[in-house]
Amino acid sequence: MRYFLDTEYNGFGGALISLALAPESGDDEFYAIVKCPDPIVPWVERHVMPYIDMVPIGLGHPALERLDAAQALSSYLAGDTNPEIVADWPEDIAQFCMLLLTTSGDMVEIAPTTFTLLRLPGFSTAANSKIPHNALYDARALRHFVLKSER
């Protein structure tokens, strides 16, 4: 199955703050907030943090330690033998992959996974998102745009 990915992170090259997967099927979404070890940069403090908890009941929970978030992601994808992760920004894929790492030389269990990076000139997740700079709503916006363009 395809999963549309969005992440929020602490400025350019900064630590992961939240990660969302919106499956093509439209149900059983994944959303995790990750404890950030660094002080939050001002732009993120203004544009991301006020909206980070604005998710549907059942998806909201306290921020997780990085390892716990990695294990939650592994559990979420466990039933899919060939997930495809779709993103419109390279940093989203990089953050996803970095979350999989647990220690030097080790990672959480995950099936063989395909990554698709879409270059979408003129499309902005933030401009099309119900709650801009919220990873879940941005992932939903990406899913909606891609599925609509495929019709």
Q: Predicted segments — roles?
A:
Residues Y3, E8-A87:
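Conserved non-catalytic scaffold segment of RNase H-like nuclease domains
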Residues F12-G14, A94, H144:
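Conserved protein kinase catalytic core
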Residues S75, M98, H144-K148:
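Residue-level signal for well-ordered alpha-helical scaffold segments within enzymatic catalytic domains
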Residues V108-K130:
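Short, flexible loop segments at boundaries between secondary-structure elements
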Residues A69-L73, D92, L142:
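Alpha-helical packing segments of well-folded alpha/beta enzyme cores
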Residues D6-E8, D92, D138:
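Acidic active-site catalytic centers that drive phospho-/nucleotidyl reactions
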Residues E91-I110:
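Substrate-recognition/cap helix-loop segment adjacent to the acidic, metal-dependent catalytic center
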Residues W89, T125-R151:
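Acidic, Mg2+-coordinating catalytic module of metal-dependent nucleases/exonucleases
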